[in-house]
């Protein structure tokens, strides 16, 4: 008789868990940001924009040097080129980390 009671109790517990799981929302909304805060997407977009600006400035400086514009030194061109290169490499590493994090999350068991 105790097996029947334990089984009934187990079934009641399972039904209660099922009802609780069905009543909770499947997805949660993103938290609201306080005024003055920026989201990760905004910060990433700003970083991409800065890398683009650095590359554009480097390219313009190199073009100015190539056509012989006065006031443009080779050292300035090389420094701008290296800054653009380093910023692009950093952005590439951030992208690689994001892709790896996404893949790790997708491979997690449910």
From Swiss-Prot:
Compartments in which it is found: Bacterial flagellum basal body
Keywords from the named record: Bacterial flagellum
Pfam families: FliE
GO BP terms: bacterial-type flagellum-dependent cell motility
Record keyword Protein biosynthesis present: no
Entry's Gene Ontology molecular function annotations: cytoskeletal motor activity; structural molecule activity
One Gene Ontology CC term in the entry: bacterial-type flagellum basal body
Domain of life: Bacteria
Location (main, coarse): other
Classification via HAMAP family: FliE (MF_00724)
UniProt family annotation: Belongs to the FliE family.
Protein name: Flagellar hook-basal body complex protein FliE
Gene source species: Pseudomonas entomophila (strain L48)
